[in-house]
Amino acid sequence: MKSLASYYFLYYLGQAALMPYLSLYLSEKGISSTLIGLLLSLWALTSVIAQPIMGMLNDRLNDRRQILMLCTVLAPILAFGFYFFDAYFALLIFSVLFPWFQSSSGSLSDSLAVEIGSKAGFSFGSIRLWGALSFSLASFVTGIVYERTGYGSIFFYFLFINAGVLAVLFLFPKIKASEHKLSMFDQAKQVISNKRFLRFIGICLLVNLSIAINFSFLPIYFKTMGFNKAWIGTTYAIAAIIEVPMFWVSAKLNSKIGRLPVLCMAAACYAVKCLTLAFTHDVYLVLASQLLDGTAYAFFASATVEMVKSYSKDETQATFQTVFAAITTGLGGIIGSAFGGILIDHMGAPFLYLILFVLCITAAVLFVISYKMSSRSISHNHLQNS
């Protein structure tokens, strides 16, 4: 457990050191906003394609750490492409290569962690909280550091931290792949034929759309509502801080009341937060609502990873995790970024959050229905066996 906790602490420390500042670095470098937008769209599209492929490859290897190690080594090296090159064509190439490995590392980490945790007897949430802790700490420190050292230093910090991540990976127990290896076609077939898993993805996509839109457009919401933009950083920090204890709480709740009820609670928290932003004109109430945001994210992130594992077989664990991440986070981010901007331009920011409320409350109801269907199925099987 200590090696996993160290891994998540360092992994999200690295993410916090690089990802929030990469677009800002490109802007400081003189890259136009139009091209930056194109590069970000290309990153998102690449992640949707890369994650399932890397997951399928991971499930076929004898040691499930290998692909993750490869991602840990190549991601910081490829990130330097943005540091050394200015040509548009070169930036486009690195906008495919870098996110191919960077985006895959997150879902592969979760797949490995939940597998180790299930065998060692601890929950995913109790490990993931260390990532939330390091990310929240880094959120306060990195901006101050980069103002002094320059934004070009983000790549060196990312490389240095990833060296630590790689060292910790060698401490992980060697997880062998299933002896029953499937072809990539059969792996894809297992995903497509699993109707319960596909329904679960559909419900989670409603929540992830809300997460993606809120993350991208919260600063614009502040601007359109006339709030002091100096509070924007504080809103993200509040959510990040509350995530730490809430990941611990989610681990307890997952084992006590079940994952689907926890997911229902997460969707309900998001719904209340979005409804608040749709109608309030008080910036302090918006700041307070971020407590719900951080709570919802911790509940949602911890429960979904464990739910996805329950749908998969031993030979397709990484495949299911990466497909889930590609669709809900990757595709959800693309759709959310596109339609969020359109809704704000035509209907205004409060109306956007009213739509997000509808999405989240719909997801909460669907999680309740799924829970009741699951309970009936378990009761029916119990009666048949007895």
What is each of the regions a protein language model found here?
Residues 26-27, 57-58, 129, 144-149, ...:
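Interfacial helix-cap and linker-helix signal at transmembrane-aqueous boundaries
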Residues 172-204:
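Juxtamembrane intracellular "pre-TM" segments in multi-pass secondary transporters
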Residues 49-63, 146-147, 245-258, 344-345:
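Helix-to-loop junctions at the C-terminal end of transmembrane segments
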Residues 1-44, 197-235, 301:
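Helix-loop boundary and gating motifs at the non-cytosolic
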Residues 144-160, 341-360:
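A membrane-interface helix-boundary motif in multi-pass transporters
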